[in-house]
């Protein structure tokens, strides 16, 4: 039997303390009724004896201690899931936000997900084509991987996210491909951009959007990514779809976590973030992957903005420990007008070797990737040397490497946000650029591939 309590004794920020409770569980959903009759939702954060601390999703403004009632519903926060969610836009709490009808759920699922037995996981191995050369060619995304994008304030990560959502697909697969997009604490303008972009290109038909705006209560940001991942798990493991989850901006999620931690008067960790930030982030990132015996998969691209462009900040630092690589956006490349401004040298996909090669992309992929990395790195060093000592100090080979580095940035990395390159086009473009270098410098490519794929001189 559900009990209703009128014993609210304290309200601090987004938190509320209810006394005299019995049989209340951690993470239990709470219905809060204000003295005005307005209803809000919350969840139990902590139970200590007969006291329960409740996190209020819609914020605590207007709550009167005497007139407020709390009803503990005996179940966690749930999302009603259905295949009809495709093509729809929801708010950060999973309510329809596009003037469409309510979803008739096939079932209701706890948004915290279930623990996955590590032995049930299957290893990521299939290539996902994003249409972005700097990712496909050099930092390949693999089905079931979690590959974050480290951006910074003012960089075009929103445009890159929209481009990937629009273009991504699994090659050589008959399975349906779906996008689940979670916007966490973004501005109204960004939300409008994403919705317009998805609708303009038709990507909305295979997508589910969860939009938590900057003007929404910060506490909702804790629920939004979990709503998105719950929807993704349903589509992947019960409907057999290949699901790509894009979450932006994880920094806003961590800020909301810090706000709750401060309200609970917890001992702060690095830079004021709670000591359990790593554990909490892992509850999001580890929901990516593949399961044995299941056709579907969940691939994650979380996007975060590094405060003060600092890679050692706790959010990117801890994210890097949990995920399988990172795509780093560069302010220097952005200032040069290179779009997307992906800095390929510090970027990394730890699973790229598992998703490339014969039968997946092309047999020469690994060799050309290694050679492009090496030549670009040498070319950048040659350009730095030229800036200090002058171009006359460079050898002929160094001059060619410096020119290669410029061409690589201008033609390979820079492609704009509307160009969708196939993996064949990306690999062929790499060969075209490598032709600028003397054959003696192409030490990382096998001779048979040089003979087979190197463009011939025009007759």
From Swiss-Prot:
Alphabetical GO biological process terms: proton motive force-driven plasma membrane ATP synthesis
NCBIfam families per UniProt: PRK04196.1
Keyword entries, A-Z: ATP synthesis, Hydrogen ion transport, Ion transport, Transport
GO CC annotation: proton-transporting ATP synthase complex
One Pfam family cited in the UniProt record for this chain: ATP-synt_ab_N
Record-stated family: Belongs to the ATPase alpha/beta chains family.
Cited function: Produces ATP from ADP in the presence of a proton gradient across the membrane. The V-type beta chain is a regulatory subunit.
Name of the protein in question: V-type ATP synthase beta chain
Domain of life: Bacteria
Matches recorded under Gene3D superfamilies: 3.40.50.12240
GO molecular function: ATP binding; proton-transporting ATP synthase activity, rotational mechanism
């Amino acid at each position: 039997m559900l009990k209703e309590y009128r014993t609210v004794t304290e309200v601090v920020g987004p938190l509320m303390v209810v006394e005299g409770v019995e049989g209340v569980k951690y993470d239990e959903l709470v219905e809060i009724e204000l003295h005005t009759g307005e209803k809000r939702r919350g969840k139990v954060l902590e139970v200590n004896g007969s006291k329960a601390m409740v996190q209020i999703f819609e914020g605590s403004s207007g709550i009167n201690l005497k007139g407020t009632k709390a009803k503990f519903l005996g179940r966690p926060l749930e999302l009603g899931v259905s295949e009809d969610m495709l093509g729809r836009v929801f708010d950060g709490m999973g309510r329809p936000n596009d003037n469409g009808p309510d979803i008739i759920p096939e079932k209701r699922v706890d948004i915290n997900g279930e623990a996955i037995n590590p032995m049930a996981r299957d290893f990521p191995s299939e290539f996902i084509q994003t249409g972005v050369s700097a990712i496909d060619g050099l930092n390949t995304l693999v089905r079931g991987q979690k590959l974050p994008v480290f951006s910074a304030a003012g960089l075009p990560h929103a445009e890159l996210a929209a481009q990937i959502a629009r273009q991504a697909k699994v090659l050589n697969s008959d399975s349906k491909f779906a996008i689940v997009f979670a916007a966490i604490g973004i501005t109204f303008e960004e939300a409008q951009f994403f919705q317009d972009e998805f609708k303009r290109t038709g990507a909305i038909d295979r997508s589910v959007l969860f939009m938590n705006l900057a003007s929404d209560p910060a506490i909702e940001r804790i629920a939004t990514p979990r709503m998105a991942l719950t929807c993704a798990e349903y589509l992947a493991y019960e409907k057999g779809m290949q699901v790509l989850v894009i979450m932006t901006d994880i920094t806003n999620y961590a800020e909301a976590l810090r706000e709750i931690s401060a309200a609970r008067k917890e001992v702060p960790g690095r830079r004021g973030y709670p000591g359990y930030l790593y554990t909490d982030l892992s509850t999001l990132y580890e929901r990516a992957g593949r399961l044995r015996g299941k056709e579907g998969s969940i691939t994650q691209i979380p996007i975060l903005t590094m405060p003060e462009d600092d890679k050692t900040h706790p959010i990117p630092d801890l994210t890097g420990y949990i995920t399988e690589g990172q795509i780093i956006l560069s302010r220097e490349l952005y200032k040069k007008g290179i779009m997307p401004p992906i800095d390929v040298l510090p970027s990394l996909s730890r699973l790229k070797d598992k998703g490339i090669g014969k039968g997946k992309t092309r047999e020469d992929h690994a060799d050309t990737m290694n050679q492009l990395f090496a030549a670009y790195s040498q070319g950048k060093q040659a350009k730095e040397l030229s800036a200090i000592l002058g171009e006359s100090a460079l050898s002929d080979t160094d001059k060619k490497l410096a020119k290669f580095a410029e061409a690589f940035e201008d033609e390979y990395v820079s492609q704009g946000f509307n160009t969708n390159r196939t993996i064949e086009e990306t690999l062929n473009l790499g060969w075209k650029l490598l032709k600028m270098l003397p054959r003696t410098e192409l030490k990382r490519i096998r001779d048979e591939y040089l003979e087979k794929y190197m463009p011939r001189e025009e007759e």
